[in-house]
Amino acid sequence: MTACSSPPRGLIILCAGDSLTDSEYPRHLHRLLAREGRRTRVLNGGRKGNTSGEFWRYLKQRGPALAREHPDFVLLQLGTNDVRVDGDHTPADTFANNMRKIIGLFREFTDRRGERARILLATIPPLPERYSFPFGPESAGRVVREINPLIQKIAAEEQLVLVDNYGLFLRSPELLPDVHPSSAGYRLLARNWYDALKPLLPDIEVRPGK
């Protein structure tokens, strides 16, 4: 896990997920928040290649250490690796169960005031028309038919803020040339998270003169 900044006060945001999180977007998100004068620490908790099950196993081990960071917000996006066609293929019901366990553990996290961390849950981007192993045409179909509907259902059941990263890249497919976005795509992804976060941010911790 890496931090984009480490101010003594301000917001703490934990970005959790797979390689789409272990990427450029947390750094871009920090810049967007800093631009408006916020003291913010953005923690990159992305795990390259992780399915929901692998991330759950990681979280069971690393959860206590992450909890000690006392994040105000957790930004969660998982599911892309669950639609692989190799041994990482995850059945829909298993994916849903994994996500509920992950969210349940994150619900135990508290910020420095002792209040529960706010969790934002994102749909996963579409898979492009060019498939490369370990993804295939059936992977793209599962994103649409299974994974994202389950994410939407879980967000509603758990009363979480839902962030539409699927629709984001559906409208800008040129920024998603492969499974991973381009550099411009990661900036767009950070902006989408920022737009979802902004209404939830307190009117505090703004640097004097801003």
Per-region residue spans from a language model:
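Serine-esterase "nucleophile elbow" of acetyl-processing enzymes
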Residues: M1-G53, L59-H70, L188
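Alpha-helical cap/lid subdomain in secreted, periplasmic
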Residues: L32-R35, R57-G209
